[in-house]
């Protein structure tokens, strides 16, 4: 997500709920997912996650990209093991400092290319631009983190083949500088689980598939999470659908605001029970009410002291 995701894109999601019934829904202790049958999915076997659970941070839009993260408060809440940091493409210098600080405070780091103006785009050139950004900036950012190639690329309407083709090209570019896991946000603002699974395993003859096996599929889960491919709001069966890809899976974002219709809490609990990493939205940086600490950067970007907000336990109790 982003400040714009929570003010612009989140508003966009709200409009989709009102106008089309589609809305935004979401790194990394991963489950090696197992094959599911199409008619009656088998339970996904539980495995301990590779990374611990944690929280999202979205600092690009506040205090020139240099807000105070409140590390001391975060460290006092020890269920937070992983931080997913969203990076606007013009914030490389700032992001280097964010990543260094997260390392020095002992966190597992997921770094996410986030371009607020193109969330949900099917334009493959935008995904290629993200890949080239990583190629240019990975070493500058200091390494030591997992790459989330691009936040929420791909609409509810993209086909498995188109999604796979675009990601094959983008992943090949990133591989010139990085050999670790690559997190792939599934299409439809993180909600089209069946599309993503088919993009990996292939669901039709001759279909293009994502060929790189060192990837993790990431869903984003909110109350308005809509699975257009299934014509309904997301439910726990979508966790099994995504698992049928045979790749590790995670919930890269979750929160309790933005639309209604999906049991976001039950879905997150189910994913966690299967061993998936879950990452709450957000420690700080949301443009609305989903900030675990107060003051929010949106209200005071220069704040240096923080306390728990009323939203804190919505996320923390899930971790």
Question: Where are the language model's segments positioned?
Answer:
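An active-site-proximal structural segment forming one wall of the substrate-binding cleft
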Residues: 67-80, 87-114, 119-149, 161-175
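Bacterial N-terminal signal peptides that target proteins for export
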Residues: 3-20
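Bacterial Sec-dependent N-terminal signal peptides
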Residues: 26-48
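N-terminal pre-catalytic segment of deacetylase/amide-hydrolase enzymes
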Residues: 41-85
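Hydrophobic alpha-helical targeting segments used for export or membrane insertion
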Residues: 19-27
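Extracellular glycoside hydrolase catalytic/binding regions
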Residues: 52-59, 64, 72, 125-144, ...
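Glycine-centered signal
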Residues: 2, 12, 28-32
